[in-house]
Amino acid sequence: MNKLTTMMLAATTLCVMAACYAKKPEPRPEPELNTTGFVNITDVVPDVILEIRYFSTYNFVGSRIDGYLQPTALLTREAADSLRAVSDDLKEQGYRLKIYDAYRPQAGVDHFVRWGKDLGDTAMKCYFYPNECKDSLFIKDYIATHSGHSRGSTLDLTLFDMRTEKEADMGGTFDWFGLESHPDCGGNPTTGTYRQNDTITAEQFANRMILRRAMMRHGFKPYDCEWWHFTLRNEPYPDTYFGFPVREL
């Protein structure tokens, strides 16, 4: 081995050692764990009422849902700003907003899926799905492996009547699995025309329309199967499903 070859091998060895011991860059957080674009709803809409059902045991599963560490509600900044406009609109009509759920981590969705596959667990059937067989919940899309809530711009909510100091009567409870929860139950939600029926009253249908119109006026789109469910039309993360837990930011 000549002198030149020896020097080249030594230089190569030093370069390899330098690469091995060089400080590695800090890993960037996975997109689904990054909370940068999210806010506490109460920081943007301070007079909103929170009743986070999945932090409690009063929900269709009957236990606190995975990923809900605190009884708070999170949304993307864009969705929260639009919700503030909704709140201001409805306050002029005598209502406040009451939120049941907003951003939902993937762990919560996975919890629903596990529960749905356990056909023997029907503890809350009489409260939320008395007319449905549990083995049909996936077929009818009541439960799915992904949820729009995990994208951060979807929420479930109702009206709180400031005059009566009670929730407005919507003709059905949040998370009721059945046709009674559909916005078109009892009328045409596009025109707001009530249709006489034995399921919901004209007043209940009108209350649903008050919420629906206010949400749509300020950039949210409704969901055909749930009167309480709305998604920001121009959501900032349409293809990202986040996984960080629900807790104060």
Residue spans for each PLM region:
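Extracytoplasmic cell-surface/polysaccharide-interacting catalytic and binding patches
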Residues: 21-102, 106-225, 235-249
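Bacterial Sec-dependent N-terminal signal peptides
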Residues: 1-29
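Conserved metal-phosphate-binding beta-hairpin within the catalytic cores
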Residues: 230
